[in-house]
C-alpha cells in the first residue's frame, strides 16, 4: 500500500473517530458491521477500507448485496462478482433479491423503487442482529446531493446533505471523493464493475455528475470537497437550530396559564401539544420556523411513506 493510500485510509479513520461511526452497540459488545456492496468502485473501496480498519476498531464485518432484478444478465454478473470477491477476501456475504423481502418488481421500476428495496433489505438485516449498515456514499455523492436539492428547492436541513450517521447506518467514506475511492481500489489491486445506468443522462443525478460537477471542477479542482464541507457546516447549523427550537417549545409548554381554555384543556387531555403564545411570539423567526417545522415533521414523514 503506497503512502497516498495510507493517507486516505487514515483520513477515513479520523472521520470515523470524529463521528463515532463504529462506537460499540452496547457496553462490552463490539458493533456488528455490514458493508453494503454493489460491486462498484465506491463499495469495493468501502470493503477494502473496512477490512483495513477492522482490527483497529474491533468490529465483526460482513457484507450484503442487493440484486434488484432490473438489469437482467448485468445484474447477475454484478452479483457473481461480489460473491467471488467476498469469498476471496473472506467476508461473509448475504445476497438479497426482491422476493427475499416479499416484493415484486413493478413494470416501470426505477431508482426510487430500487432504493426502497435496498432499505427494506437493510431493515431485515438490522432486525436479524446486524447493528449498523455501512454504505459507500462519498464526498462526490454529497456534492451531487447538495446540488440536486438546491435545484429542487431545500432549506437548511436539506442543505446538510447526507449525514455521516443515523440509527442503523453509517457512511465512512463521506470524506473521500469518487476519484479517491478508485485510487484505493487500484492501490489494493481491487477490481470493480461499472453500472451502465450511471453512464447515461437519463437520471437528473447523472446529468449533475457529468455536467455540473466537471464545470465546477474547472473553476476550482477542490469543488467537490468544498461542497461537501458546506454540507457539514449546514448540518451543524441545522442541529443548533433544532436544539434551540426544542428549548423554545419546552419553555412555551411550561408557561401555560393555570386555567386553560376548554379547547386547549381537551387537547392536552387527548395527548396533543399545547403551548403558551407569548414565548413563541418573542422567539427569533428562524427558531420559530424550525420549531413549527418540527411539529409538522411526523405528518410529512407519514405522507412520504
Where are these regions (language model features)?
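Alpha-helix boundary/capping and short turn/kink residues
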Residues: 152, 156, 217-221, 239, ...
